[in-house]
Regions:
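Acidic/polar, glycine-rich intrinsically disordered N-terminal extensions of enzymes
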Residues: 1-82, 96, 652, 663
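Long, structured ligand/cofactor-binding scaffold of large enzymes
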Residues: 55-257, 264-269, 370-373, 392-395, ...
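Terminal amphipathic helices with adjacent charged low-complexity linkers/tails
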Residues: 82, 100-156, 292-417, 593-657, ...
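Mobile "lid/hinge" segments at catalytic clefts and subdomain interfaces of large enzymes
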Residues: 199-341, 347-350, 466-469, 474-486, ...
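Extracellular/luminal Protease-associated
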Residues: 288-295, 556, 778-822
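Segments forming glycine/polar-rich beta-alpha architectures that bind adenosine-containing cofactors
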Residues: 650-726
Length: 920
């Protein structure tokens, strides 16, 4: 705890007859180190952590002074931030479990007690990313999907159960419970923790990191938390502070109130668009102003959820009366809620705040209008009334159709001339093709038709206003006799069981089911690409006619090929609009002026005819939701169903690796582990494995979805007699490095400019010029002892906090990446794996420098080690001796990050320290 320098800041706090210790921020103000009223609330919370954990070793008095000295226009200072807990989801949690198991195995091989590898902060792993929508539209869809989920993931789930018994304070929320961020919001989040440290009770603010980029959703209840890669989360679990540069903090001042008919989803799409324009990457965002009181906590959580889409590290709302009311509504203990109030008031962390910010952004809630986002980025907001013009323009832009809606000459890839009018292999915009489904149903589909309509994702299923709104709209539609077209795959995947409970109590679940929105699972499903298969005849029609079909979902991401590889255009919308566009069956429609369908009397029905009013939604929520619901549903949150209880899992301190397993294999990271750190040196005679454009996502780098037998990962499984129907997804195979390294840079939509933008995981081997897969090329380079680099444009690694995007990069032999800019989590994950993230100088890039990607590359300036933000020199030399020289900056901001790189990664550093302590 706090060093002698700040021992006065450790004070006693009395509450209800109990005495607690606390790190009192007001003492720092009394000492003249800060003006608390001027510090953003998020910075105060960071400051409390630094103060409380200052031990004179990893966290010293200078760190406390640095955090206390935050000012809007002062250069960043490095501070070590220690979180109070960690949350994991299973796709990123399984590789974390595998890494922890591998660390124990490495310790055991060195003759060290393996239990030295032990989490030092509490951890919750929520299994939510594995359920897929194989069955839908029936009463038994949920049971069938869960049954298949266990069949596919039994081995992974056994490893998770092993971890639960092997590690202290490692809790597992079993399948079928909910989505990690909604469970976190409704139950796990405490706002303030009571913790025992060395026999004394302490009060500490709830802070966390999570292995999912949408962890900032917890900011809706005033908790500082953000997404990190599994690598960094594991380090935090093992007691490592997160060394970070104090961020700029952008204050968003909200005014006004949402107009009638506008939803929290519409609001978050507006804010996401706005903050992407402002530029908040690597920054904290705090919301304040009179408009905040007009938003429910669920609305706030919807906004906080999309922090990564906005570009920020966190988007938070400081705790106020509405926060405490939400804690009460969701079944938190009344005595704890009062403790939260008193502690936060004592720390100056409660109620309306107007501190000084790096930048202030004004946002008027009155200006929000019904909107969607698409076709492939969450910040591409489109007013609902503009969709009928948007979609034809999109198809022309992509070269799918020419002027007048006729098919363009070409293959639908965008290569055709936009003004071509001669019929090619495609389909005119206004024509349909007949398709006979497996059950004999005949449908017609064309460009713009909605094939997936999914009420999904914690972004929106955590918000009763939009869920009840969707239910009421479904009721009104059913009463009019409206139906969903047979070609639309409908699904409802609540983020917690409480949602189903209040929809049933409000008698709205039946109305949703009447339209086909049956519960398919309690997990992420379509939002993360687990939408399941489309009917084979529909997929065949898409391929045969180059159809640009669509999906509409209440999620937070719509990247290319994420929702389904056959669906080209994906749109984010509120749950009521998801139902509305499902009813319409197409996206090229103006629902403000065109009918959504016809009723039983043949009369045209418009969206406004079935849209529920705000007061009806509010009254339904009031009548249908109670604290007892939350208490009941979360009383057995760690127990699971009969399937989970019956699952036979390994026991013991060291995991028993199965060399025949295709799901869980010991990774190579800590095998033959040296106690000396390897350091870092110049890179010579490197080759570019890929050259990429802008906004290459972690989905592009490490896809999570299905893959075929023709790809390297599929070939590896086929060689081990795994049938194609048991391949499962990349995400489910993250405990197997053999599959994952073969899947790196293997997304079907990634475009490698070494092959003139050809889609898929292909590249050129130099100097032979042979086209091959990225994995096969990397293996040839490995045999030739050739180091590799990757070059890219802006926003490299945007998207999900996918540690395998960095692990796979490392295992392919890539020593450095060079991009114009990076998304924070991917950059940090690269550092966490010992890979150098380098940035071109302003105004430069591989294209601007005239690089082709077939050169030899030398990175110099590392002969004496690495310094934070070091400027390095790169020389690119062609086969005929011509050279291009340019400078890059190492995006390694702190001395601790340098240590990670020089040790080959953060876990390598942690293991090296643990082993050294035990062996010396």
């Amino acid at each position: 705890m706090a060093t002698d320098t700040f021992s006065d800041a450790i004070r006693e706090f009395e509450h209800d007859g109990e005495t607690y210790k606390m790190a009192d921020l007001t003492v720092l103000e009394e000492q003249g180190l800060c003006d608390l009223d001027k510090l953003p609330v998020s910075i105060r919370i960071l400051l409390e952590s630094v103060l409380r954990n200052a031990d004179g070793d990893q966290i010293d008095a200078d760190s406390v002074r640095a955090a206390a000295s935050w000012e809007p226009d002062v250069p960043d200072a490095e501070v070590p931030f220690t979180v109070s807990r960690v949350v994991l989801q299973d796709l990123t949690g399984v590789p974390a479990v595998v890494d922890l198991a591998a660390l124990r195995s490495a310790a055991d091989r060195k003759g060290v007690d393996p239990t030295v590898v032990e989490p030092e902060v509490p951890c919750d792993l929520v299994i939510d990313h594995s359920v897929q929508v194989d069955h839908f539209g029936t009463d038994d869809a949920y049971e069938k999907n869960v049954e298949i989920e266990y069949e596919r993931n039994e081995e992974r789930y056994r490893a998770i159960k092993w971890a639960q018994q092997a590690f202290d304070e490692f809790n597992v929320v079993p399948p079928g419970t909910g989505i990690v961020h909604q469970v976190n919001l409704e139950h796990l989040g405490r706002v303030v923790h009571e913790r025992e440290v060395d026999g004394e009770q302490w009060l500490v603010p709830d802070t966390l990191v999570g292995t999912d980029s949408h962890t900032p959703m917890i900011g809706g209840i005033g908790v500082v938390g953000w997404g990190v890669g599994g690598i960094e989360a594991e380090a935090a679990l093992l007691g490592q502070p997160i060394n970070m540069s104090l961020p700029d903090v952008v204050g968003v001042r909200l005014s006004g109130e949402l107009p009638e008919g506008a939803t929290a989803t519409d609001l978050v799409l507006h804010i996401t668009e706005k903050l992407r324009q402002v530029g908040v990457v690597d920054k904290f965002v705090e919301f304040y102003g009179p408009g905040v009181s007009q938003l429910s906590v669920a609305d706030r959580a919807t906004i906080s959820n999309m922090a990564p889409e906005q570009g920020s590290t966190i988007s938070m709302f400081p705790v106020d009366e509405k926060t405490l009311e939400y804690l009460e509504l969701t079944g938190r203990d009344e005595e704890h809620i009062e403790l939260v109030r008193e502690y936060l008031e004592a720390q100056g962390l409660f109620g309306e705040q107007e501190p000084e910010y790096t930048e202030t952004v004004e946002f008027d809630l009155d200006e929000v209008e019904p909107s969607l986002a698409g076709h492939k980025k969450p910040h591409q907001r489109i007013p609902m009334g503009d969709l009928d013009d948007h979609f034809p323009a999109l198809l022309e832009e992509q070269g799918v159709i020419g002027a007048g809606g006729e098919p363009a000459i070409g293959d639908g890839s965008g290569a055709a001339a936009a003004d071509a009018t001669d019929a090619g292999p495609g389909l005119p915009l206004d024509e349909k093709v007949p398709v006979e489904l497996e059950d004999g149903t005949e449908v017609e589909i064309g460009h713009g038709d909605v094939l997936v309509s999914a009420i999904t994702s914690c972004t929106n299923t955590s918000n009763p206003s939009v869920m009840v709104g969707a239910g009421l709209l479904a009721r009104n539609a059913a009463e009019q006799g409206l139906e969903i077209p047979d070609y639309v795959k409908t699904s409802l995947a609540p983020g917690s069981r409480v949602v189903t409970e209040y929809l049933e109590r409000a008698e709205l679940l039946d109305d949703l089911e009447e339209l086909g929105y049956h519960v398919v699972g309690y997990g992420c499903t379509t939002c993360i690409g687990n939408s399941g298969p489309l009917p084979e005849p529909i997929e065949n029609a898409i391929d045969e006619h180059d159809l640009w079909t669509t999906s509409v979902l209440s999620g937070n991401r719509n990247f290319e090929a994420r929702i389904h590889p056959k669906i080209q255009a994906n749109y984010l919308a509120s749950p009521p609009l998801v139902v509305a566009y499902g009813l319409a069956g197409r996206m090229d429609i103006d629902l403000e002026t065109e009918p959504i369908g016809t009723n039983d009397d043949g009369e045209e029905v418009y969206l406004e005819d079935i849209w529920p009013d705000t007061e009806e939604i509010r009254q339904t929520i009031h009548d249908s939701i109670s604290p007892e619901m939350f208490e009941e549903k979360y009383a057995s949150v760690y127990e699971g169903d009969d399937r989970w209880e019956a699952l036979d899992a390994p026991t013991g301190d060291v995991y028993d690796w199965d060399s025949e397993s295709t799901y869980i294999r010991e990774p190579p990271f800590f095998q033959d582990f040296p106690l000396e750190k390897p350091g870092v040196d110049n890179v010579e005679d490197a080759r570019a494995l890929l050259t990429l454009g802008d906004t290459v996502t972690t989905d592009h780098i490490s896809p999570a979805g299905l893959f075929g037998e023709d790809l390297p990962a599929g070939q590896w499984l086929t060689e081990r007699d795994v049938p194609v129907h048991e391949f499962n997804t990349y995400g489910s195979r993250r405990g197997n490095h053999e599959v994952m390294m073969r899947g790196t840079f293997a997304n079907v939509r990634i475009e490698n400019e070494l092959l003139d933008g050809k889609e898929g995981g292909y590249t050129v081997h130099h100097p032979t010029g042979e086209e091959t897969t990225v994995f096969e090329a990397s293996e040839r380079y490995r045999e030739e002892d050739t180091p590799l680099i990757v070059m890219a444009g802006d926003e490299l690694g945007t998207g999900s906090s996918r540690d395998w995007a960095a692990k796979g990069t490392d295992l392919l032999g890539i020593r450095a990446t060079i991009g114009k800019s990076y998304e924070r989590i991917y950059r940090d994950n690269l550092i966490g794996m010992g890979v150098l993230p380098l940035q071109f100088a302003e105004g430069e890039g591989w294209e601007e420098l005239g690089l082709e990607g077939d050169e030899y590359f030398e990175i110099s300036g590392l002969e004496n080690g690495l310094e934070p933000n070091a400027e390095l020199d790169v020389t690119a030399e062609t086969d005929d001796g011509e050279t291009v020289e340019f400078s890059v900056t190492a995006q390694v901001d702190t001395p601790m990050a340098v240590e990670y790189v020089e040790n080959g990664g953060v876990l390598h550093l942690v293991l090296r320290r643990l082993l050294t302590e035990e062996l010396n």
